[in-house]
Swiss-Prot record:
<dbReference type="InterPro" id="IPR035908">
    <property type="entry name" value="F0_ATP_A_sf"/>
</dbReference>
<feature type="transmembrane region" description="Helical">
    <location>
        <begin position="202"/>
        <end position="222"/>
    </location>
</feature>
<feature type="transmembrane region" description="Helical">
    <location>
        <begin position="181"/>
        <end position="201"/>
    </location>
</feature>
<dbReference type="GO" id="GO:0005886">
    <property type="term" value="C:plasma membrane"/>
</dbReference>
<dbReference type="InterPro" id="IPR045082">
    <property type="entry name" value="ATP_syn_F0_a_bact/chloroplast"/>
</dbReference>
<keyword id="KW-0813">Transport</keyword>
<feature type="transmembrane region" description="Helical">
    <location>
        <begin position="142"/>
        <end position="162"/>
    </location>
</feature>
<keyword id="KW-0406">Ion transport</keyword>
<dbReference type="GO" id="GO:0046933">
    <property type="term" value="F:proton-transporting ATP synthase activity, rotational mechanism"/>
</dbReference>
<keyword id="KW-1133">Transmembrane helix</keyword>
<keyword id="KW-1003">Cell membrane</keyword>
<comment type="subunit">
    <text>F-type ATPases have 2 components, CF(1) - the catalytic core - and CF(0) - the membrane proton channel. CF(1) has five subunits: alpha(3), beta(3), gamma(1), delta(1), epsilon(1). CF(0) has three main subunits: a(1), b(2) and c(9-12). The alpha and beta chains form an alternating ring which encloses part of the gamma chain. CF(1) is attached to CF(0) by a central stalk formed by the gamma and epsilon chains, while a peripheral stalk is formed by the delta and b chains.</text>
</comment>
<dbReference type="GO" id="GO:0045259">
    <property type="term" value="C:proton-transporting ATP synthase complex"/>
</dbReference>
<comment type="similarity">
    <text>Belongs to the ATPase A chain family.</text>
</comment>
<keyword id="KW-0812">Transmembrane</keyword>
<dbReference type="GO" id="GO:0042777">
    <property type="term" value="P:proton motive force-driven plasma membrane ATP synthesis"/>
</dbReference>
<keyword id="KW-0375">Hydrogen ion transport</keyword>
Amino acid sequence: MVHPYLFLQFFRKLLEPLHISEAGADAIAYTWLIIALLLILSMLATKGLKTVPGGLQNFMEVIIGGVENMVVETMGHHGKPFFPLIATLAIFILVSNLIGLVPGFFPPTANINTTAACAVIVFVTTHVVGIKEHGFKYIKHFLGPILWLAPMMFFIEVIGHFSRVISLTLRLFGNMNGHELVLMIFFGLAPFLVPLPMMLMGVLVSFIQAFVFMLLAMIYIQGSLEEGH
């Protein structure tokens, strides 16, 4: 699903030699745009830091502080090392969701490749952290408490862990792509005031989906840090 007109059209020409689909090229182009915007915003917010923050610095400190508090409350103080990853994913997903509300812009999270990439990052981090924390004993997370049921539980747990990737991918993709479809239908029927309620709803959906993804990422990583039974 793409908007009737798009920003950064020249990226399509740039990506043509890679034989990427139109939707994929749009997602890549807008992902680069969001990364550039976040980098510029970070540099502006950290330029000339003051003890008493104001303006952009204060705004960014509120956001970062809120995410950090949520990480500590959910994962405990041993979850602080994962704060940069969680915050990066949350802010990237939120901005990606919100940018689709600007006419002519495409949200990267409405492309399944973007959401799958974010989900795979969480999946890999979860198991790398688990192996690093527990070593070979990490396999206990997959065996269950009853020894004679261990083979069956291992199979079930492996499927369950892979289903997390599918769940994270499809939940975010489905909500954002569905919202894009509905918004485009409303714009096609009545391009002025009628789509406004859906755009306001889109703001709420954008925040909720970013929060849900962040919360599940913290829960999965926290689970890998716990002792297996």
